[in-house]
UniProtKB/Swiss-Prot annotation:
Highest taxon in the source lineage: Eukaryota
Identification of the protein by name: Galectin-4
Gene that this polypeptide is encoded by: LGALS4
InterPro entries to which the protein is assigned, alphabetical: ConA-like_dom_sf (IPR013320), Galectin-like (IPR044156), Galectin_CRD (IPR001079)
Role noted for this protein: Galectin that binds lactose and a related range of sugars. May be involved in the assembly of adherens junctions.
CDD domains referenced in this protein's UniProt entry, alphabetically: GLECT (cd00070)
Positions annotated to bind a beta-D-galactoside: 256-262
Galectin domain sequence ranges: 19-150, 194-323
Molecular function terms, GO-annotated: carbohydrate binding
């Protein structure tokens, strides 16, 4: 069962290195690039480049380069006409060897904003116009789990992390009308427990995206799709870390239904990031994790359109929720 990303959400899972690929539709203000990976135990350095074109001698609008060299630091720069510009550096290392990390680079009107594991780290002023950037390049001593290009939604959502305005879809990022849709704007790093209203209800073809991190001491977390007025839960997703299973259920008319436990794999593990896409279909929910089909859950609540609330709680740190 193939994974099809929703509009404005362009993920690549387990990409190989060196990574040098076009940015879908080109780079533009309001986009964010999410990079999840693991720093190698013997890491010396890695880099992320926002590149104008492809091939030797291409200009680099933004060069992000963590260096473990005894004087741990992160270097920032640009390259034009084959020459590096004035180097900026920060003598602080947000990455540790071996643990998983999440790097977010937000493209704002005046600068790139770098966020590591949810914490703002650096701002690098634009030296080359953003709209000229066409490719993303990543290489070095790391293993990539996913690269996500996020953008193209119509309005920002307030949240703890400053959220860039998302421009309306242009000719480069229009999506076929049969793709699943996301109704709301993204929220970055919301606190847990998390609760939000699903404006318009849980209609068929709607997709919810949840990106998060399970702490090393994590034991359990819960995701509920709920009818606010009655308390009914159309879909209850309960990863139990100590048991290594993902339990699904419903709670209707004051009673829990039969648990479903079988799944093709378990993406939830202590100390790991996850990327969950939950699609509502006419007869079932289809749930994907890290680009792979995880499970289906047939509707038990006939009026699933009445689901108007999303709840997330437990041992999880959320980095991104798109409704």
């Amino acid at each position: 069962m193939a994974f099809v990303p929703a509009p404005g959400y362009q993920p690549t899972y387990n990409p190989t290195l060196p990574y040098y690929k076009p940015i879908p539709g080109g780079l533009r203000v309001g986009m964010s690039v999410y990079i999840q990976g693991v720093a190698n135990e013997h890491m010396k350095r890695f880099f992320v480049n926002f590149v104008v074109g492809q091939g030797p001698g291409a200009d680099v609008a933004f060069h992000f380069n963590p260096r473990f060299d005894g004087w741990d630091k992160v270097v920032f720069n640009s390259q034009q006409d084959g020459k590096w510009g004035n180097e900026e550096k920060k003598r602080s290392m947000p990455f540790r060897k071996a643990p998983a990390f999440e790097l977010v680079i937000m493209v704002l009107p005046e600068h790139y904003k770098v966020v590591v594991n949810g914490d703002p780290f650096y701002e690098f002023g634009h030296r080359i116009p953003v709209q000229l950037v066409t490719h993303l390049q990543v290489d070095g001593d790391l293993t990539l789990q996913s690269i996500n290009f996020i953008g193209g939604q119509p309005a920002p959502s307030p949240g703890p992390m400053p959220n860039p305005g998302y421009p309306g879809p242009g000719k480069h990022n229009q999506q076929p009308c049969n793709l699943p849709c996301m109704e709301g704007a993204p929220t970055f790093n919301p606190p847990v427990p998390y609760k939000t209203r699903l404006q318009g209800g849980l209609v068929a073809r709607r997709t919810i995206v949840i990106k998060g991190y399970v702490p090393p001491s994590g034991k359990s977390l819960v995701i509920n799709f709920k009818v606010g007025s009655s308390g009914d839960v159309a879909l209850h997703i309960n990863p139990r870390l100590t048991e290594g299973i993902v339990v699904r259920n419903s709670y209707l008319n004051g009673k829990w239904g039969a648990e479903e436990r079988k799944s093709s794999f378990n993406p939830f593990a202590p100390g790991q990031y996850f990327d969950l896409s939950i699609r509502c279909g006419l007869d079932r929910f289809k749930v994907y994790a890290n680009g792979q089909h995880l499970f289906d859950f047939s509707h038990r609540l006939s009026n699933f359109q009445g689901v108007d609330t999303l709840e997330i709680q437990g041992d999880v740190t959320l980095s991104y929720v798109q409704i």
